[in-house]
A protein has these predicted regions:
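Bacterial N-terminal signal peptides
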Residues: 1-6
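Sec/Tat signal peptide C-region and signal peptidase I cleavage site
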Residues: 7-13
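Acidic/polar, compositionally biased interaction segments
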Residues: 13-176
Length: 216
């Protein structure tokens, strides 16, 4: 028997961010159909997770502790396999907005004290092992600043781990080598006990089944 593997090449386990100058309470941003009043980017970079409580300090490297907007974006991979109903929670101060692919899952663009129960999504039916685009907007007008992303994926609420994030979509790479392909080409026309061997390819293109017509 020949063994074959499918390799998943994961990008850096981060999210990309951009910080912008804020414009007071409930500033306009692209997610709510508006545009940034001051679209000049203050800073850019990557973060390993959404787990911040800045208090009255500077938000990331924006040079601001208030009147600031941050857009975090990248990809999130759902663990395990099969269809899952997942709830997301944003612990945020002040407003927050979040999309998974093209679906808005949280939209609470308001002045609030931090608390993830104020920012909770409905159940999102997602597939384990699949990767989705994530887009989070957040702003701070004044006072304390915080942003953390949690999910309920197993029946309990937990911080989304950094391993779930990636800056670019992971690429699935075939583990079938040219040498293995040659071996297949060699054996596929041979007969076993006078019976023809058929080789079929199924699934994602990386799983190969060898079927013998006749004797099992």
């Amino acid at each position: 028997f020949l063994c074959f593997a499918t390799l998943s090449t994961k990008a850096m386990a981060d999210l990309t961010y951009k910080t912008y100058a804020g414009t007071g309470a409930r500033p306009s941003f692209p997610g709510n159909g508006g545009s940034l009043t001051y679209p000049t980017v203050l800073s850019t970079g990557t973060v390993t997770s959404l787990n911040y409580n800045w208090g009255s300090g500077y938000v990331l490297d924006s040079g601001r502790g208030s009147s600031v907007i941050v857009n975090f974006y990248g990809y999130i991979t759902i663990p395990d396999t099969g269809s899952q109903d997942i709830q997301f929670y944003l612990y945020a101060d002040d407003g927050a907005y979040m999309k998974i692919d093209s679906t808005v899952v949280i939209n609470d663009w308001n002045e609030q004290s931090p608390g993830m129960w104020n920012y909770i999504s409905t159940d999102q039916t997602l597939t384990g092992g699949q990767t989705y685009y994530i887009d989070v907007w957040w702003y701070e007008n004044g006072g304390g600043a915080a942003l953390k992303l949690y999910w309920d994926q197993t029946g309990s609420v937990a911080l989304v781990p950094s391993s779930a994030y990636s800056t670019t979509e992971p690429v699935v790479v075939s583990g079938i080598t040219s040498s293995q392909t040659t071996k297949f080409n060699t054996i596929r026309n041979k007969a076993v006990n006078g019976n023809q061997i058929y080789i079929t390819q199924t699934g994602d293109g990386n799983t190969l089944n060898i079927l013998q017509d006749g004797d099992d």
